[in-house]
Design a protein with these regions (language model features):
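N-terminal subdomain of nucleotide-sugar transferases
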Residues: 1-58, 64-66, 94, 122
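Glycine-rich nucleotide phosphate-binding loop and flanking beta-alpha elements
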Residues: 51, 106-107, 134
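Glycine-rich His-Gly loop
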Residues: 14-15, 103, 132
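Short N-terminal targeting/anchoring amphipathic segment
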Residues: 88-109, 113, 123-129
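Active-site proximal beta-strand in glycosyltransferases
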Residues: 8-9, 98, 117-137
Length: 146
């Protein structure tokens, strides 16, 4: 992992580049990382597959921090490493200014790490981005599951 003097933000997101099938959320987080490159360094924790696919992303080494851009590193977690133990170790690697959760209804990449971060009392600002998931139209879909 890179050491930097910029403020550090940890992002949890189900899918990230080169995954693309989830569309907008991937692109908006990518755009945020690029727009804030002068002031922040991002650590992105994501899965090593694309939405609806059990296949690993091609050319990606899972479970290892990889340089993504001048201001970001990404860890692509395999299914067997999306565990409480792994998330705790990621949350403890260093102090983060903020921890950003890019979903509301994702157990592995929002609820579990949010619960762990809250209980660790890291001092980091916790940002939960529901991304329209609380809209009346969205709540009508798969109501029981949500």
């Amino acid at each position: 992992m890179e050491s930097t003097h910029k403020k550090k933000i940890l992002i949890f997101i189900d899918w990230y580049r080169p995954a693309y099938l989830a569309g907008g959320p991937i692109q908006s987080v990518f755009n945020m990382v690029n727009a804030l490159e002068k002031d922040y360094f991002f650590y992105i924790c994501t899965s090593n597959s694309d939405i609806g696919s059990g296949n690993e992303l091609v050319g990606i080494t899972p479970n290892k921090w990889l340089k993504s851009s001048s201001n970001s590193e990404v860890i692509y977690l395999s299914a067997e490493n999306r565990t409480k133990k792994t998330f705790l170790s990621i949350l403890k690697i260093q102090e983060f200014e903020s921890i950003y959760f890019n979903s509301l209804f994702s157990f592995k990449f929002s609820l579990l790490p949010l619960f762990l971060a809250k209980n660790l009392n890291t001092g980091s600002k916790l940002i939960l981005a529901p991304r329209g998931m609380l809209g009346s139209g969205s709540l009508k879909l798969k109501k029981t599951k949500k």
